[in-house]
Amino acid sequence: PDCEERELSRLNNFFCFPYLNKIDVLNTPSWVKNTVWYQIFPDRFCNGRPEISPEGVEPWGSAPTSFNFMGGDLWGVIDKLDYLEDLGINGIYFCPIFTSASNHKYDTIDHFSVDPHLGGNIAFHTLIEEAHKRGIKIMLDAVFNHLGADSPIWLDVVRNGANSHYADWFWIHKFPVYPDTPKSEWDFKNFNYETFGNVIEMPKLNTENEECREYLLSIVRYWTQNFDIDGWRLDVANEVDHHFWRDFRKVIKDIKPECYILGEIWHEGTPWLRGDQ
């Protein structure tokens, strides 16, 4: 017995704790820890150029609704950068700014253009330059789980059905994608494709499709390389496959190692926090 106890004592908890390899540990860029973020819903923040506001824009200060527009734009944000700096913030997280039909812009039409009613790519480029001069970081909201129903990619599927080049970019149960009934009768029980949150205007992307994946990754390359953004906030990240997020991280970190990646996870986040997503 004494000999057996001595042998056991030599183990010193061997195998009781896992060995953590550096590559498996999630590293948050050091600058993030000292960043005070300010979230901006662009349409509601400041109208810098009324001439680019959407048609039917509400008078500033009107009661907000789910669908109305107030006319806020990126020029307005530029006008208020000194004010934001005085508040003590040093990071701006923007709700989606890419071209779309809604005020919230989670229904993307074109991922490669800032919505013209927000000032387009020129306004965004100017904003980045002016923010960086003040030491303010910029994080964009990336919606890679779904597209908007007005996206040319989705409209091609609507028109051409199974013959569309993009038919496999979405999770479609059968064609045609829309039911043969008046639109007033459509609901999540009778349309023929997967969506985000049962919202018919947001068809869900199939990120297992190689072309679809590469399209989305090309968006990341474009904005990170050409506009030097500092972070990506990933909308409903838990609804996009892990393989895609691993590729996403590699693309981002190859371009800008200090770029911040933040995922929206509505439940236990551990599977996304292993250093590879």
What residue spans do the PLM features occupy?
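Noncatalytic carbohydrate-binding groove/subsite architecture in carbohydrate-active enzymes
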Residues: 268-277
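Substrate-binding/active-site clefts of carbohydrate-active enzymes
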Residues: 41-90, 97-221, 226, 248-254, ...
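Conserved, well-ordered alpha-helix/loop/beta-strand core segments that scaffold catalytic motifs
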Residues: 223, 230-233
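Glycine- and other small-residue-rich loops at beta-strand/loop junctions that grip anionic moieties
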Residues: 237
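Hydrophobic faces of well-ordered beta-strands that scaffold small-molecule active sites
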Residues: 36-38, 92-94, 138-140, 232, ...
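The feature marks proteins involved in alpha-glucan
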Residues: 1-35, 48-59, 64, 68-69
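Aromatic- and carboxylate-enriched substrate-binding clefts and catalytic-loop regions
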Residues: 252, 260-265
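Carboxylate/His-rich catalytic cores and anion/metal-binding grooves
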Residues: 33-46, 277
